[in-house]
């Protein structure tokens, strides 16, 4: 079996990153100008990486699927970004953030990578403040913090409910400066279709101009993928509709391993599904769980009345409400990690206590917070989120609904779990390089930092850590040996072959000429993924799901209809290319979930749970990173490789959020 070298430095975990930086290879300024780097993606990870590499003097080509980097999905992040500043003097530290992240990930993350993430977190806040990011501040002017799930300290920095937007504007300003200087060339409305390998190394990409429809070749000494996750394989998710995994899957087909694809995060606080016409779901920030309390009725008859629309949540008095997270997990209450909160909501709804007409919703209530703090303070913290919820549902969570026996009850939100984030992704080593030399993956599209479950407010932290403070060091260790390599010509046969393969795939899709639209097949895919590869998984269900996924792939291959022409702009063609890769990724998620006969974090196999319904890990047999290797054809099952996990600073134990 292939032995996997993750290139983790020697020494204590707290010294690994410092020692690495002290001994890594460097590229001098004159040589940096001769080296080209392609960065695919302009979200927080991609924009920060492109800006940093350009500022260092490299020649950078940055690709953006949207009209502007400001439309990257990072802009949708609401609640905040974690850092171990300990401004609240509540016991936080780099080690505490490291420990909480490993524990939150159910001990399935690589220890050394997580410690580095916690270590550089403080620098991220300093960098963003210097860029002018308007983080919330206390009355005295100091940066404010709030709490997120899986932590007992307040370490989350935020800008109301638009933290991702403000951080992205900061990264975009840094990127724009380098575009103006000339070190970065920005390509908007381009989508990567394949990575080009020359002598086994990543030397460029084939990208589709989404305006003209033409395929174009781009060469570089190294390629960085920063294209996000694969949550849209489930069709309904909190991801933007353009989010896709085509770049990642193209790397997988060329030999990059896909790691832990079964680790998919389901966010507990999303607006429930309303009918079968929706194209996406809306997230309600985890920050709401700071002051919001999650509950269902204690009495099933009350739940039935709610489902029939005979009563409202505000009609149920305090003594008849079950604040089930506070009851089950007294130490963390409503701030348990996302996988725990999501499964608890599903369990209550499956037991018949759901509160809407589908029975698939629970309440998130702010009555106690408004009574304790006053409506003005609550609106200062969450007003924009309340407005968004009202815009979508026509219910104002800050509006007094009823007063019973002197107790004021406000309109509660209805929430239910939904697909949100993918902890799995392209395998990378400590240097963020994939199993293909010269190909790097950063941000959500890699697997490296979150194990089986990501803590809230840590996605923004990882994206900016990778782009600002990790990749600029590690990529030099690779490029230092490339300084004598001249710039590549896109006339090389490897580029021609890659472009030809993509063009043939496009021709094939356009010539299927079936009857089913891209969206209809995507909906079928999403239904199968949610039903069989969603929150509750079983061996039997996963086998059924794999069979159905293969049927969906056959339907695509025989009955897909794409209107229009392959020349020029064709949005349906672009969606079809992405959909086929979602199907391949969906199969990979199911294979990994079926192979992993344990429950951990976001991967919950119903056969493997405790008597209390908690995840039951199997550290003896599954204490590894699952790396899936492509076998040359979409028809062949991938081969599993294993990277054993090694923990030196943390004792592996069963997660406990009850005490």
Model-found features: residue ranges?
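Core beta-strand elements of the Rossmann-like FAD/NAD(P) dinucleotide-binding domain
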Residues: 33-35, 213-222, 435
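Glycine-rich loop(s) and the adjacent beta-strand/alpha-helix scaffold that form part
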Residues: 222-281, 450-473
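Conserved redox-cofactor binding core of oxidoreductases
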Residues: 124-214, 226, 270-284
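Short beta-strand "acidic-cap" motif of Rossmann-like dinucleotide-binding folds
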Residues: 58-64, 259-260
């Amino acid at each position: 079996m292939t032995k996997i070298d993750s290139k983790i430095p020697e020494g204590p975990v707290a010294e690994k990153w410092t020692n690495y930086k002290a001994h890594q290879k460097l590229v001098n300024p004159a040589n940096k100008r001769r080296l080209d780097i392609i960065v695919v993606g302009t979200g927080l990870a991609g924009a920060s990486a492109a800006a940093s590499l350009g500022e260092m003097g490299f020649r950078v080509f940055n690709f953006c699927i949207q009209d502007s980097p400001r439309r990257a999905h990072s802009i949708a992040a609401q609640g905040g970004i974690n850092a171990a500043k300990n401004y609240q003097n509540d016991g936080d530290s780099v080690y505490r953030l490291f420990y909480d992240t490993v524990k939150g990930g159910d001990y399935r993350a690589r220890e050394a990578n997580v410690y580095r993430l916690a270590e550089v977190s403080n620098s991220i806040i300093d960098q963003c403040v210097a860029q002018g990011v308007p983080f919330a501040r206390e009355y005295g002017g100091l940066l404010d913090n709030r709490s997120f799930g899986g932590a007992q300290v307040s370490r989350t920095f935020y800008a109301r409910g638009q933290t991702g937007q403000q951080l992205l504007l900061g990264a975009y300003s840094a990127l724009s400066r380098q575009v103006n200087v000339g070190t970065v060339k920005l390509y908007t409305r381009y989508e990567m279709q394949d990575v080009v390998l020359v002598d086994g190394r990543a030397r460029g990409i084939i990208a589709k101009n989404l305006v003209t429809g033409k395929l174009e070749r781009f060469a570089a000494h190294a390629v960085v993928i920063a294209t996000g996750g694969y949550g849209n394989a489930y069709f309904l998710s909190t991801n933007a509709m353009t989010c896709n995994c085509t770049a990642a899957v193209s790397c997988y087909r060329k030999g990059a391993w896909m790691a832990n694809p079964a680790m998919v995060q389901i966010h507990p606080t999303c607006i429930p599904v309303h009918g079968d016409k929706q194209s996406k779901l809306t997230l309600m920030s985890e920050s709401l769980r700071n002051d919001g309390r999650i509950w269902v009725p204690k009495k099933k008859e009350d739940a039935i009345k709610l489902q029939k629309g005979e009563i409202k949540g505000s009609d149920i008095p305090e003594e008849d409400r079950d604040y089930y997270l506070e009851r089950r997990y007294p130490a963390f209450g409503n701030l348990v990690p996302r996988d725990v909160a999501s499964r608890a909501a599903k369990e209550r709804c499956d037991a018949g206590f759901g509160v809407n007409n589908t029975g698939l919703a629970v309440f998130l209530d702010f009555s106690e917070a408004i009574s304790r703090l006053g409506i003005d303070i609550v609106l200062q913290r969450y007003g924009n989120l309340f407005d968004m919820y009202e815009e979508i549902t026509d219910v104002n969570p800050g509006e007094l609904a009823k007063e019973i026996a002197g107790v004021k009850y406000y309109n509660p939100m209805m929430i239910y779990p939904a697909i949100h984030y993918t902890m799995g992704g392209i395998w990378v080593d400590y240097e963020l390089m994939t199993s293909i030399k010269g190909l790097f993956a950063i941000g959500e599209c890699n697997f490296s930092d979150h194990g089986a479950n990501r803590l809230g407010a840590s996605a923004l932290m990882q994206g900016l850590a990778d782009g600002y403070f990790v990749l600029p060091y590690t990529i030099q260790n690779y490029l230092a040996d490339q300084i004598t390599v001249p710039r590549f010509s896109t006339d090389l046969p490897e580029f021609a072959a890659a472009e030809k393969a993509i063009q043939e795939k496009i021709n094939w899709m356009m010539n299927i000429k079936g009857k089913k639209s891209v969206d209809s097949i995507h909906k079928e895919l999403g239904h199968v993924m949610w039903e069989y590869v969603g929150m509750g998984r079983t061996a039997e269900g996963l086998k059924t799901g794999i069979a159905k996924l293969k049927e969906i792939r056959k339907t695509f291959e025989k009955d897909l209809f794409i209107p229009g022409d392959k020349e020029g702009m064709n949005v349906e063609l672009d969606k079809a290319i992405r959909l086929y890769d979602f199907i391949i990724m969906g199969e990979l998620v199911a294979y990994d979930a079926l192979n992993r006969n344990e429950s951990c974090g976001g991967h919950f196999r119903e056969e493997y749970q405790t008597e209390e319904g908690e995840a039951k890990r199997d550290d003896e047999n599954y204490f590894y990173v699952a790396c899936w290797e492509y076998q040359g054809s979409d028809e062949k099952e991938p081969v599993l490789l294993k990277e054993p996990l090694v923990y030196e600073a943390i004792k592996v134990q069963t997660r406990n959020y009850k005490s």
